[in-house]
């Protein structure tokens, strides 16, 4: 292995030296180049000298022969200097030419012409108005400030699952605004993800402790969809034998509607009744959902209710409130089977509906039926505790249509914020907040009774007071004039929900609202001593929670700051290096894009506030919808789906609703290529569709004749085709327009998965190709950061004939943007009207700053970067699929299958070794087992592309040493990877290679290296010994003592 190290060093250094000479001599080269220095970091001087961008000549012109004569300045030199595309698209014009030449093309455009089929190529893409040229960064900030000023943030007492909260500044600045947290990917590579894995384990512990159930996932999209997932679990637990699901009318209306929509695909009947009228006599009820506390504030004792349900073979789902559970008897102690809810009020802003981390907790008995990611405890190669994602065989990327859910990663960033909020406040701090909120609600209720102008509900409550009066609308209007939002339930009923941000002064203002013009003879402060706890002792929590030291140590800002950074330092993010995951598009999340996300005028808006108070948001939605229509060639967009998986489901439900409207109830067959993302068949199954798989040919294209035969065989029942373009194999299929025609000729609709939209924007479009509906992953193509596993957004675009069926909402009606002439919405997809509205400014600013030209260039450079890397690697690794002219799209697959026989090396070994080089591995063994799929994106510099290629080439040399017999097949630098400091600095070293080579296999690592913090994690051990919460301190100490 020492020889491998020397050869790798020699090759890299030789190339760098030769390139330096060529730069000095002013030579152009077709050879791959990197920066002038072997370090990945380039000085500002050399950067200016060697990477000048967008400069075609001098800014000045000379009017005479000598330098002393007058010079005039060009108009171009006076234009704004803070244009954005040159900051996002990393390759300079010179580098673009170099890389295109290296790939065998005269220039970038000839490469693109040879890659994108002419039959689907757009002449150009053009936006209307100011967005076509693209706003500068300063103009964009000014524009967003103007939009923010149009949002009128009233004091909210609406509740309904959304509450104002104080986001601790230490969490806001160091997690929500910190790219080291928000640019991470889902923690598939556990060894370089231990920080967020620990934080997500903390989250799961918060959920299990507060709900009283032993298992929780690491987040779901929102409370409404979490309830729908629980409904599906009840159906699965009883193996589909009972087809009725009962929802108590005390649940939030958005939750009821989301469940009703989801039930259609499972052929479930949803019955909504008053809780006292729940009836199981039909014998067909699989589950029942109740709210605790209820949507109108009531706190009920569910003890006998749960016993009765279980006696009738019915599973009980409770939707709950985490803050309330610090005071209320936990659902697990009632015997609830599944508990769902949102962690929003634990330090996550409302953000006009999201993103927020929801949760689902259940018993060990149902753990394999749970949806979503679950973090578990395992051990690493040294026997030390390490964390990983557990039980992945349940998930869609493995089980496809047999998966527990189509959900992928959900809301990891927000789950981390929720967990840190609990860590910061601890059990006593959380209880103090809850008692204060309850006390303010109680003082308000007491004051209303003294006023005598309205009646207060007599049932116990936590934070929400139900008020009945003669004219609720008049009170609602009076409150609005004082910039206060109440919940208007009906003409005689109002609810008032209190939260962490409510003050005694706010309560006094409420007294004035309800006093009907009469003077108020008391204050909230004067009434406070008279209020007694409104929660009966039978419903008061007695069991302890959050007893682990982590929740009892970090209560000062300094301590929490250090804990956050301790975890952050364990995780690789885009702050460190490129993350070349195929089909994931880990591109730049620019600072200007991220700034508005934490502005109070965007963060503090309740999703059910009257739309006239949210005109800034509404204007942005309209602009964004129209821009996305231009980009995709569609006629209308829905912004409601709050994840890519949610977008897939929504798009297929639109197709289903369309067929239903035409009387084609029998159309339920969905054709899906075997190479499709796992979410595709899982989403189709959720819509009640029958899946017909079609294969691919040797070149990675859909087998068109097989597709034609499948479509014709199912023409009477064909609902849809799901297709990804470019294909998941990383090529532009020449026959895509023919594929669309085949489906349409046989009565189906074409659903395009937008995962690879980064290779379409400005060059072609789903609508132009022939698709009828497509979801966009805004967290891929349009720059929303991945957040370590969420948030994301999956809005759907449709052709005109499908626009009437776009989803709406029971509280704030919504539809397509632009709005179609007629509407017949399919139902409700997510809990909030516009999904995770708070992160939409990210995509909006990206599109607006790039302009049509910048976006088109981004697609071109993404394709160029992929082809350049494929060319550099092709003599070391087989590139599996190419288009008709020998090029790839924006991603490509390298084949490692042969190494299993020649050296005993698997893709996992290569991915783990890349960690020692400071990189996250590409996508492993998908869509083809035994391969790696690489996607560089347009925002990675040529120097970074070269560095990654150098790492893979060096690893190939390491493999060759095994093949030649110079390294042990079972004990080598790849099988031993990654190499954390704890291993390298141990007293003993028994490896047949040196510590130095294990740690520093490439020259750039000497100046800057990201260190994995654990050895290779044992996946099998973790699933066989499943632990998904923090262990009690004494067990941890015992484990540490044993491993030592």
Curated annotation (Swiss-Prot):
One of its GO terms (molecular function) is glycine dehydrogenase (decarboxylating) activity. The modification N6-(pyridoxal phosphate)lysine is found at residue 780. Its cofactor is pyridoxal 5'-phosphate. Residues 1-72 form a transit peptide. Keywords: Mitochondrion, Oxidoreductase, Pyridoxal phosphate, Transit peptide. The keyword Oxidoreductase applies. It is found in: Mitochondrion. GO terms for biological process: glycine catabolic process. Disruption phenotype: No visible phenotype; due to the redundancy with GLDP1. Gldp1 and gldp2 double mutants have a seedling development arrested at the cotyledon stage even under nonphotorespiratory conditions. InterPro entries: GcvP (IPR003437), GDC-P_C (IPR049316), GDC-P_N (IPR049315), GDC_P (IPR020581), PyrdxlP-dep_Trfase (IPR015424), PyrdxlP-dep_Trfase_major (IPR015421), PyrdxlP-dep_Trfase_small (IPR015422). Its EC number is 1.4.4.2. Expressed in leaves. Detected in roots, stems, flowers and siliques. The keyword Electron transport does not apply. Its main location: mitochondrion. PANTHER family: GLYCINE DEHYDROGENASE (DECARBOXYLATING), MITOCHONDRIAL, GLYCINE DEHYDROGENASE, DECARBOXYLATING. The glycine decarboxylase (GDC) or glycine cleavage system catalyzes the degradation of glycine. The P protein binds the alpha-amino group of glycine through its pyridoxal phosphate cofactor; CO(2) is released and the remaining methylamine moiety is then transferred to the lipoamide cofactor of the H protein. Homodimer. The glycine cleavage system is composed of four proteins: P, T, L and H. Belongs to the GcvP family. NCBIfam families: gcvP, PRK04366.1. This is Glycine dehydrogenase (decarboxylating) 2, mitochondrial.
């Amino acid at each position: 292995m020492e020889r491998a190290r020397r050869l790798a060093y020699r090759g890299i250094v030789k190339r760098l030296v030769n390139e330096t000479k060529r730069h000095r001599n002013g030579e152009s080269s077709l050879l791959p180049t990197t920066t002038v220095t072997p370090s990945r970091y380039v000085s500002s001087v050399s950067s200016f000298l060697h990477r000048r961008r967008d400069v075609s000549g001098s800014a000045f012109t000379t009017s005479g022969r000598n330098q002393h004569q007058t010079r005039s300045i060009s108009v171009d030199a006076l234009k704004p200097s803070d244009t954005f595309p040159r900051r996002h698209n990393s390759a300079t014009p010179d580098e673009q030419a170099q890389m295109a030449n290296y790939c065998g093309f005269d220039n970038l455009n000839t490469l693109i012409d040879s890659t994108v089929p002419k039959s689907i190529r757009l002449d150009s893409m053009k936006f209307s108005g100011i967005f076509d040229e693209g706003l500068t960064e300063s103009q964009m900030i000014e524009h967003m400030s103007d939009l923010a000023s149009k949002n009128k943030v009233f004091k909210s007492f609406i509740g309904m699952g959304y509450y104002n909260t104080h986001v601790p500044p230490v969490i806001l600045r160091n997690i929500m605004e910190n790219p080291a947290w928000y640019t991470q990917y889902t923690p598939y590579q556990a060894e370089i993800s231990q920080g967020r894995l620990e934080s997500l384990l903390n989250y799961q512990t918060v959920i299990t402790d507060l709900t009283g159930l032993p298992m929780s996932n690491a987040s779901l999209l929102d409370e409404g969809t979490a309830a729908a997932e629980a409904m599906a679990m009840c159906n699965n637990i009883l193996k589909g034998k009972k087809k009725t699901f009962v929802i108590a009318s005390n649940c939030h209306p958005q939750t009821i509607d989301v469940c009703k929509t989801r039930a259609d695909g499972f052929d479930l009947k949803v019955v909504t009744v008053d809780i006292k009228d729940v009836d199981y006599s039909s014998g067909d009820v699989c589950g029942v959902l109740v709210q605790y506390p209820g949507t109108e504030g009531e706190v009920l004792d569910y003890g006998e209710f749960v016993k009765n349900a279980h006696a009738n073979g019915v599973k009980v789902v409770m939707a709950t409130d985490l803050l309330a559970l610090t005071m209320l008897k936990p659902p697990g102690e009632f015997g609830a089977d599944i508990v769902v809810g949102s962690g929003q009020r634990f330090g996550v802003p409302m953000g006009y509906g999201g993103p927020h981390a929801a949760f689902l907790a259940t018993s060990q008995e149902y753990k394999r039926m749970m949806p979503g990611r679950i973090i578990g405890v395992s051990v690493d190669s040294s026997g030390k505790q390490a964390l990983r994602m557990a039980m992945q065989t349940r998930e869609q990327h493995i089980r496809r249509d047999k998966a527990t859910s189509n959900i992928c990663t959900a809301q990891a960033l927000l789950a981390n914020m929720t967990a840190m909020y609990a860590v910061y406040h601890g059990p006593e701090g959380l209880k103090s907040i809850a008692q204060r909120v309850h006390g303010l609600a109680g003082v308000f209720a007491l004051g209303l009774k003294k006023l005598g102008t309205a009646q207060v509900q007599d049932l116990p409550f936590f934070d929400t007071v139900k008020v009945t009066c003669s004219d609720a609308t008049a009170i609602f209007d009076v409150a609005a004039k004082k910039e206060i939002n109440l919940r208007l339930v009906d003409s005689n009923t109002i609810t008032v929900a209190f939260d962490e941000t409510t003050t005694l002064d706010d309560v006094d203002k409420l007294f004035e609202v309800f006093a009907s013009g009469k003077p108020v003879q008391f204050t909230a402060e004067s009434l406070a001593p008279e209020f007694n706890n409104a929660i009966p002792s039978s419903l008061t929590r007695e069991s302890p929670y959050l007893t682990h030291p982590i929740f009892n140590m970090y209560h000062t800002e300094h301590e929490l700051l250090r804990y956050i950074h301790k975890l952050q330092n364990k995780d690789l993010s885009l702050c460190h290096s490129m993350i070349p995951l195929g089909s994931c598009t880990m591109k730049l999340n620019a600072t200007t894009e991220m700034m508005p996300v934490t502005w109070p005028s965007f963060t503090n808006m309740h999703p059910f506030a009257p739309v006239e108070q949210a005109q800034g948001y509404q204007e942005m939605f309209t602009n964004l919808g129209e821009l996305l229509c231009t980009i995709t060639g569609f006629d209308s967009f829905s912004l409601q789906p709050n994840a890519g998986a949610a977008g897939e489901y929504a798009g297929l439900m639109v197709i289903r609703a369309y067929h239903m409207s035409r009387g084609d109830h029998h159309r339920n067959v969905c054709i899906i290529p075997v190479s499709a993302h796992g979410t595709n068949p899982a989403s189709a199954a959720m819509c009640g569709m029958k899946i017909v798989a079609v294969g691919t040919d040797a070149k990675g294209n859909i087998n068109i004749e097989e597709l034609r035969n499948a479509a014709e065989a199912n023409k009477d029942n064909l609902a849809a085709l799901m297709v990804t373009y470019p294909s998941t194999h990383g090529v532009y299929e020449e026959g895509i327009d023919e594929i669309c025609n085949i489906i349409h000729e046989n009565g189906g609709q074409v659903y395009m998965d937008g995962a690879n939209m980064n290779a379409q924007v400005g060059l072609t479009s789903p609508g132009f190709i022939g698709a009828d509906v497509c979801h966009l992953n805004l967290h891929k193509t349009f720059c929303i950061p991945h957040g370590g596993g969420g948030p994301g957004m999956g809005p759907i675009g449709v052709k005109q004939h499908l626009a009437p069926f776009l989803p709406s909402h029971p509280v704030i009606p919504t539809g397509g943007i632009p709005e179609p002439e007629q509407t017949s919405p399919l139902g409700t997809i997510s809990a909030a009207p516009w999904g995770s509205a708070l992160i939409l400014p990210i995509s909006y600013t990206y599109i607006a700053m790039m302009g049509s030209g910048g976006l088109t260039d981004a697609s071109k450079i993404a394709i160029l970067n992929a082809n350049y890397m494929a060319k550099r690697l092709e003599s070391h690794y087989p590139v599996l699929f190419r288009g008709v002219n020998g090029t790839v799209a924006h991603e490509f697959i390298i084949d490692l299958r042969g190494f299993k026989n020649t050296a005993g090396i698997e893709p996992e070994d290569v991915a783990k070794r890349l960690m020692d080089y400071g990189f996250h591995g590409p996508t492993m063994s998908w869509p083809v087992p035994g391969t790696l799929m690489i996607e560089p994106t347009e925002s990675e510099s040529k120097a970074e592309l070269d560095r990654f290629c150098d790492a893979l080439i060096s690893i190939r040399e390491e493999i060759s040493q095994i093949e030649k017999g110079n390294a042990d097949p079972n004990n080598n630098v790849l099988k031993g990877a990654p190499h954390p400091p704890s291993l390298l600095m141990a007293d003993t070293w028994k490896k047949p290679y040196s510590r130095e080579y294990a740690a520093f296999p490439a020259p750039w690592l000497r100046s800057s290296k990201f260190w994995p913090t654990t050895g290779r994690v044992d996946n099998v051990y973790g699933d066989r010994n499943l632990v998904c919460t923090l262990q009690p301190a004494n067990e941890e100490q015992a484990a540490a003592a044993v491993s030592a």
